[in-house]
């Protein structure tokens, strides 16, 4: 078979191009893991440890002071969680860990009901296989928040409530440490299920899944964290807002939105760098949209979810943020599609 | 001279210059054609046909996204059923590209994205929602005239897909979700929904049998189904509760049982389904069951006689599944434009083709002259 010089040169250029492209995602993904996921999980694990220690100290010497220390540790742990909440991928997807971290929204008060049962006999939590079969409603931060803040529980005055709190906090810290260790000891590409015969590199497939997770999480922030509790389209359900009792709803949103910007810029080349090289207009448009998200969230008053605003007032105040998140989601979808990723067709919109 | 119904049908189709599949299928198709809706970008929607080599042989633009094709059993007619809330079924002759007919739902009704022809091809059977009341309907029209012959209750709310058990009985997946086209993704009866599978007589609309999930699982929406030659019906659920709830997602049922026989699978696989089953399909022998989950990114398989889990094929955004005429073999289509052929019992899967910039929509159908 004859191959012209031009055809050969073109083939070499094409191969070189695709190789460079693959390497680009190799580096970006490696750095997303080493400079974002692992450090954020280190923070999350460290604050979970602090929370476990604080609840142990509280139960050892119950007082308003030790309670306050435990609450502060809890708030820090929530904020660390919000940095990685967008990522329902990898170790956190096993043993229902992701859903156990937050049993939210708990529309039927399952957490409180199950906590009351545990508090009636906390010794059940010490049995060897308790945590392997325990309900996800009592395995994570939603349960801890209830014990620290819900009026049904009094961890200062009632030993059994505090015992439950201490056990859950300890379990939460262990789980988080396990997730961290698995991230430290594996590569992101270990956590995907590649198709037979696919031509896409594992790195490409992982980055694609991360982008899908990011896009989906924007919907969570806009819909579940903001629109639903304030009654943007329906009746308000403020008490079902995320971490409402500990008044962490708005800080959590703000942390999520800042995390997006962080994610966009982590590593070298970062997602932003690659996007700027290939799709500069879209890359810049997303950059502006992500900045606008943070700006719009900062416009909301600190007591936005807790003060006595009317539904109409809350909706009016939320509009710029709702529009901004929608816009950033569109920009992100457009960009990742142009970068050659599939954001899902049947998986995003079936029937 | 009195004209028999069959003769009349033949003459009607002849008058419309519709050939039979057997007389007109191109050699390139090698006796079989696959049909699916697909989209290019966000606004360009089509229905198309491809042969066993995966090459697109024909396509026609559609006004909106379609959900499942409906294929005439004898003549070269394929319909694209609009996605819920659907207001059209566009019929084409895929061998010429000619648009044959558009059928619209009854007044104040919409389609659910699926339809089926009777075994003799003389009747078109659709599932429809009378949206002012939420009543599920099975509507039987003459084909090709489109005249409404019968209108039966589906036996529930939200009749999504139906399959023929035999020439007189249809099995209906009543999903249980009441919706209205004004806000079609809002579920109006989430807390009270009661999905069921209904076996309905096509002769008189009589309910022959029904089965439904137990009350604790009332959010287990029954959406897609298939029936094998042994009369076993497989059901794929779309759970409307929380993602973390441990619920069954696949079941078998028969016409003489009112209980659902849930199929086991490893928990790590069940969790990956994300509570969502796409297509449900038996193989040619009826012994292998395939269930796709685009959200999970795989197709799962079971051995039907023993009800045991066989394994999965990982495939991003996969949804379309159809049996070939070989035992234990399926063709799969995905939102990434791929067409694959899988033999799950020998763990062999290979890509037939991939059409760039094209998203195969939910369901795949096939006409086969080789059987």
Where are these regions (language model features)?
Chain B
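Blade-loop segments of beta-propeller domains
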Residues: 62-91, 97-117
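Asp-box/WD-like beta-propeller blade repeats and closely related beta-sheet repeat scaffolds
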Residues: 108-113, 127-165
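N-terminal export signals
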Residues: 1-26
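Beta-propeller blade signature
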Residues: 138-142, 190-202, 248-255
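Residue-level detector of Asp-centered blade-edge/turn motifs that repeat once per structural unit
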Residues: 73-74, 119-120, 165-166, 228-229, ...
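Repeated scaffold domains used in trafficking and secretory/extracellular systems
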Residues: 65-71, 110-116, 157-163, 219-224, ...
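Short, conserved, GDST-rich strand-edge loop motifs in beta-rich repeat architectures
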Residues: 127-130, 173-193, 236-247
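A short beta-strand motif characteristic of beta-propeller blades
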Residues: 55-60, 100-105, 147-152, 208-214, ...
